[in-house]
C-alpha cells in the first residue's frame, strides 16, 4: 500500500448541476439560508455558504440531464431538529421529519429545484474516525484504499 502523504484534506464541496441557476440560487439563499457568491452575468456558477459548509452550483448545458435520485450532498449540522424547524418555518417542502439512522446520525432531506436530494444530518455520538466510520473502520476492520 502506498503511504498517505502528511498533508491533510481540508474540506470538500459538492458541485450540483442546475438547469436554471437563478432559481437554484434563490432556493438555497432564501429557503435554505445560504449566502451566495456568483460568477458571470447572468450567473453561470455560484458558491453558496452557510457556516463552514459550501455547495457549488453550475449551470448545465441545455442538452445535459444528469440528476441523481440518491443523495447529491450530505451536509453535517450541529442541531438537525432546529434546522428542520427553521426550514419548516421558511416553507421548504420537507418529505419527512428528522429520523435517527443505524449509522449514528439523525437526518432529513430536501429536494432542490433540479431534483437533487440534499441530506442534512447530525452525528449523535461523534467518533474520532468521522461520522458513520467508527462503526465500520478501525476497531476490527481496515479502511479500503
Residue locations for each model-derived region?
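N-terminal beta-strand motif that seeds the catalytic metal site of vicinal oxygen chelate
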Residues: 1-23, 71-73, 123-145
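Vicinal oxygen chelate
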Residues: 11-20, 46-49, 64-90, 106-111, ...
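Amphipathic alpha-helical segments
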Residues: 22-36
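Conserved short beta-strand elements that form part of the metal-binding/catalytic scaffold
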Residues: 35-70, 117-122
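Short acidic/glycine-enriched loop/turn segments that link adjacent beta-strands
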Residues: 41-44, 102-106
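A short acidic/small-residue loop/turn micro-motif
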Residues: 63, 102-103, 123-127
Amino acid at each position: 500500500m502506498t503511504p498517505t502523504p502528511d498533508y491533510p484534506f481540508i474540506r470538500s464541496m459538492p458541485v450540483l448541476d442546475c438547469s436554471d441557476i437563478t432559481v437554484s440560487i434563490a432556493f438555497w439563499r432564501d429557503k435554505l439560508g445560504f449566502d451566495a457568491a456568483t460568477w458571470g452575468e447572468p450567473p453561470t456558477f455560484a458558491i453558496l455558504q452557510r457556516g463552514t459548509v459550501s455547495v457549488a452550483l453550475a449551470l448545465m448545458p441545455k442538452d445535459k440531464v444528469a440528476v441523481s435520485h440518491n443523495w447529491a450532498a450530505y451536509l453535517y449540522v450541529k442541531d438537525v431538529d432546529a434546522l428542520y424547524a427553521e426550514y419548516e418555518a421558511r416553507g421548504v417542502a420537507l418529505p419527512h421529519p428528522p429520523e435517527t439512522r443505524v449509522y449514528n446520525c439523525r437526518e432529513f432531506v430536501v429536494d432542490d429545484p433540479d431534483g437533487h436530494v440534499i441530506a442534512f444530518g447530525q452525528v449523535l455520538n461523534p467518533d474520532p474516525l468521522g461520522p458513520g466510520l467508527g462503526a465500520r473502520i478501525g476497531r476490527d476492520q481496515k479502511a479500503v484504499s
